[in-house]
């Protein structure tokens, strides 16, 4: 072995060794316990970031540890390769998205290999490969046949200049990101998946089928699915269209979870697209203009929640079903046509949004719920106004005096008797719109015939292959203009010339089942095969909390659809979920001459702190652009690493300077996996120094008689026949005590304490000085072998190199499959124990006694101790108190 630790040489040699033996290729083996661990597949954006390094190292540590414990472990990797960034890059660089994507995949794969990850690359998938997305199309056709997929109109963001649909993130302050044009809302047809058919099961299994998921994520899923128990009822009206027919049969339906407040309704609000709104707008230019204004707002519930609530009176009146009083109908920009019936009742006294709306537009407020001891203020909202648990109905006729539950039942019964309403369960969850008016995605397998309309592509003609030579120019859908995509296409029914569907699928489709394709990635005849039966469900899934809702919910839904189609047998795809914390770094900025913020790399800045250590200012250490060193900049605190904030750390730079093992070790040691990690350059240096200490100790150990390295000195047996000295026993006690804790921490995936345990081991080994005492060499060799195996999942390269170089592999085989060290319970037994010595209740020192000493022996040892004799001045104790294993107290 080379004397100096040179990480790049060590890591290249280890990786070459693993590559030569095809170390990570995994096959199904029914004789072994299986474990499937997977990180969420990355988008090939160009380079790995530190969040990737952390995620994949967590996965790698888990799989290596389990492999040493006899498991058949699968750790695959793939690429979530479709999506908008590739189109944006194509616009910027003038290259096809396919070229940009595959170049990025090649580079990021090389980075992963440099990290030493135990990935089975034979199972690699890229979602932009026709052999993969063929099965997206195949399952879509199956869902279409089963009625799970269907077509309807959808509201989208439309850029009138580029003549294209924009994703929500491409709309900035109501304008297109490229053209600056005011974005319009348009209704266009698209395909949806009936995820709502699975709402009850998706919700029910959150608590029963996801035992290894964080409670936070389960709560987020429950809230997103959003089961609501309430009443759906109608306000009647006599509003007729131009032909004289009643609009919606003279009924405007709403849903409420607070039917106990029905007598407090003072207005209703409808969505801008509601039939009553459109009817009223025909003779009302101001209302028509307001409806057009609403079309430039957000289309999602989240966007509507944050935007200013606006409304306009339609002039229409509906009738309250219980009071028969007239109720004004307003158009509200906060009401979505896609939610419920596109209309809501307004109860300003008991809903905070309605209260603000009523105060803004001078609408009546009627209190119908009272909490004992509270005073209602019509000018200021108070949280108790919406308290249904403590509230009692007032000003509500026959319902007055009722609790929430009583009033719900009574109101529902009354409305049902009138034929105007009924109790109903509704869901916040909406069907999944999968059509995207983009180029770089899975083509939807539909052909549009002038005679037969939308016709499914026959299965034998799959996949419908996406053209690879498109370079989007930002105007319109490239697939509309790509004649090669439509060339020779005929209707499967009548054979006449037709055109393909030019919408592509939402990229969440790609990521909803890739983990099943890993199980059988080369299968050309089936979407999934026998591999899925062996590996699924996945035992451990690892990814960011940002995917807690959509990706995980869609993956659960997709799995249930595949189950119902007989493709898999599992109900839930992921048994356990770990959401790793973000990697954070300092953020520094300064307003430029144009008013925009410029961000500075933290390594170019130094902080100015007060006496408490609080950062009070920051300045440039070096010149940056036209700014000289010493220029003051603003310190914005700690935030997530990102390109936009210029506070990222390039893993490649870290690996080239310190090695992959240091990068891996640092990201694991600094914080528990689920917690955020605050970047600290000094701690990175500390991780490197620790590995150098391990290497140096290995070099030192190589100078002693390594013939002693055999099965009896590597922790595999209890070493009963060796006469260990007192010092060697103490070393073995320390090593095996830490090993017991480290093993427990590995099982809990608390990798930060695993690393701290390894540091305790190297301290114990370095501090051992009795190298010539009985059994000393054996204890050292055993201890270092245990340390290498404990470190191996975190820092596999250095552990492999030392394991091979010191001869451990000759007995126990390659570290890949070496058995995990077993705790020697005999080593944990102590010959002597140290007890605290107190005199008159005050700690004065300690005594060492035999581990099996009796109470009398302990008393005598304490009385005979030098400390007691010195302080007692010849006096004898009046009383001796012994607490076994802890202390002895002499009362004088």
Swiss-Prot record:
Motif mapping: 'HIGH' region: 42-52
EC numbers, comma separated: 6.1.1.4
GO molecular function, one term: aminoacyl-tRNA deacylase activity
Reaction equation(s) it catalyzes: tRNA(Leu) + L-leucine + ATP = L-leucyl-tRNA(Leu) + AMP + diphosphate
Binding-site residues, ATP: 643
Subcellular locations according to the entry: Cytoplasm
Chief place of localization: cytoplasm
Pfam families membership: Anticodon_1, tRNA-synt_1, tRNA-synt_1_2, tRNA-synt_1g
Keywords: Aminoacyl-tRNA synthetase, ATP-binding, Cytoplasm, Ligase, Nucleotide-binding, Protein biosynthesis
GO biological process: leucyl-tRNA aminoacylation
GO cellular component: cytosol
Keyword Cytoplasm: yes
'KMSKS' region (motif): residue ranges: 640-644
The keyword Ligase is assigned to this record: yes
Family: Belongs to the class-I aminoacyl-tRNA synthetase family.
HAMAP family recorded: Leu_tRNA_synth_B
Protein's recorded name: Leucine--tRNA ligase
Source organism of the structure: Albidiferax ferrireducens (strain ATCC BAA-621 / DSM 15236 / T118)
Source species taxonomy: Bacteria, Pseudomonadati, Pseudomonadota, Betaproteobacteria, Burkholderiales
């Amino acid at each position: 072995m080379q004397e100096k630790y040179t990480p790049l040489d060590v890591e290249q040699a280890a990786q070459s060794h693993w590559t030569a033996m095809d170390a990570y290729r995994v096959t199904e083996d029914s004789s072994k316990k299986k474990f499937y661990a997977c990180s969420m597949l990355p988008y090939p954006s160009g380079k790995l970031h530190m969040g990737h390094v952390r995620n994949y190292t967590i996965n790698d540590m888990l799989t290596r540890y389990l492999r040493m414990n006899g498991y058949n472990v699968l750790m695959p990797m793939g690429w979530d390769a479709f999506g908008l960034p590739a189109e944006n890059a194509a616009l910027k660089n003038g290259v096809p998205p396919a070229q940009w994507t595959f170049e990025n995949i090649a580079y990021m794969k090389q980075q992963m290999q440099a990290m030493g990850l135990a990935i089975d690359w034979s199972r690699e998938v890229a979602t932009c490969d026709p052999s993969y997305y063929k099965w997206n199309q195949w399952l879509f056709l199956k869902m279409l046949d089963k009625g799970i997929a269907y077509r309807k109109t959808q509201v989208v963001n439309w850029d009138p200049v580029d003549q294209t649909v924009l994703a929500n993130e491409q709309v900035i302050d109501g304008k297109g990101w490229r053209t600056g044009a005011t974005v319009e809302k348009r209704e266009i047809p698209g395909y949806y998946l009936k995820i709502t058919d699975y709402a009850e099961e998706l919700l029910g299994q959150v608590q029963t089928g996801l035992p290894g998921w964080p409670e936070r994520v389960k709560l987020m899923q429950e809230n997103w699915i959003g089961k609501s128990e309430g009443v759906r009822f109608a306000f009647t009206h006599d509003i007729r269209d131009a032909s004289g027919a009643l609009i919606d049969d003279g009924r405007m339906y709403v849903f409420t979870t607070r039917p106990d407040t029905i007598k407090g309704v003072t207005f209703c609000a409808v969505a801008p697209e509601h039939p009553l709104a459109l009817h009223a707008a025909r003779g009302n230019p101001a209302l028509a203009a307001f409806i057009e204004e609403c079309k430039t707002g957000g289309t999602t519930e989240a966007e509507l929640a944050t935007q200013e609530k606006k409304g306009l009176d339609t002039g229409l009146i509906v009738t309250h079903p219980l009071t028969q009083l007239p109720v004004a109908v307003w158009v509200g920009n906060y009401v979505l046509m896609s939610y419920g019936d596109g209309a809501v009742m307004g109860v300003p006294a008991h809903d905070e949004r309605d209260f603000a709306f009523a105060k803004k537009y001078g609408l009546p407020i009627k209190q119908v719920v009272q909490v004992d001891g509270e005073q209602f203020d019509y000018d200021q909202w108070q949280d108790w106004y919406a308290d249904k648990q403590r509230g009692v109905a007032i000003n509500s006729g026959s319902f007055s005096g009722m609790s929430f539950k009583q009033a719900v039942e009574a109101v529902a019964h009354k409305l049902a008797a009138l034929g105007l309403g009924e109790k109903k369960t509704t869901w916040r969850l909406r069907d999944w719109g999968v059509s995207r008016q983009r180029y770089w995605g899975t083509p939807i397998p539909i052909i549009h015939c002038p005679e037969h309309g939308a016709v499914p592509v026959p299965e034998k003609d799959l996949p419908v292959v996406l053209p690879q030579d498109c370079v989007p120019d930002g105007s319109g859908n490239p697939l509309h203009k790509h004649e090669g995509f439509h060339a020779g296409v005929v209707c499967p029914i009548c054979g006449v010339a037709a055109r393909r569907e030019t919408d592509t699928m939402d990229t969440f489709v790609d990521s909803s089942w890739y983990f099943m394709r890993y199980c059988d990635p080369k299968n050309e005849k089936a979407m999934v095969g026998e591999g899925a039966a062996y590996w699924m469900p996945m035992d451990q899934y690892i990814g960011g909390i940002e995917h807690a809702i959509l990706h995980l919910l869609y993956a659960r839904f997709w799995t249930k659809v595949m189950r119902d189609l007989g493709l898999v047998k599992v109900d839930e795809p992921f048994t356990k979920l770990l959401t790793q914390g973000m990697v954070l770094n300092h953020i520094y900025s300064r307003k430029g001459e144009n008013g925009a913020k410029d961000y500075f790399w933290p390594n170019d800045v130094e902080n100015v702190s007060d006496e408490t250590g609080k950062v009070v200012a920051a300045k440039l250490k070096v010149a940056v652009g036209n700014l000289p060193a010493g220029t003051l900049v603003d310190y914005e605190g700690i935030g997530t690493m990102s390109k936009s904030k210029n506070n990222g750390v390039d893993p490649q730079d870290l690996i080239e300077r310190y090695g992959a093992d240091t990068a891996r070790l640092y990201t694991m040691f600094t914080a528990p996996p689920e917690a955020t990690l605050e970047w600290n350059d000094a701690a990175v240096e500390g991780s490197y120094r620790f590995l150098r200490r391990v290497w140096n100790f290995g070099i030192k150990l190589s100078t002693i008689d390594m013939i002693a390295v055999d099965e009896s000195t590597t922790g595999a047996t209890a070493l009963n026949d060796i006469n260990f000295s007192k010092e060697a026993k103490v070393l073995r006690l320390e090593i095996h005590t830490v090993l017991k804790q480290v093993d427990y921490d590995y099982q809990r995936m608390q990798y930060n304490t695993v690393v701290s345990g390894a540091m305790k081991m190297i301290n114990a080994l370095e501090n051992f000085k009795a190298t010539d005492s009985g059994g000393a060499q054996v204890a050292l060799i055993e201890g270092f072998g245990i340390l290498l195996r404990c470190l191996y999942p975190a820092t596999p390269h250095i552990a492999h190199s030392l394991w091979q170089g010191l001869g451990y592999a000759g007995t126990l085989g390659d570290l890949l499959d070496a058995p995990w060290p077993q705790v020697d319970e005999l080593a944990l037994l102590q010959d002597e124990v140290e007890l605290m010595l107190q005199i008159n209740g005050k700690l004065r020192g300690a005594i060492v006694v035999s581990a099996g000493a009796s109470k009398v022996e302990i008393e005598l040892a304490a009385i005979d101790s030098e400390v007691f004799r010195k302080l007692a001045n010849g006096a004898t104790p009046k009383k001796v108190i012994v607490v076994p294993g802890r202390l002895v107290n002499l009362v004088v």
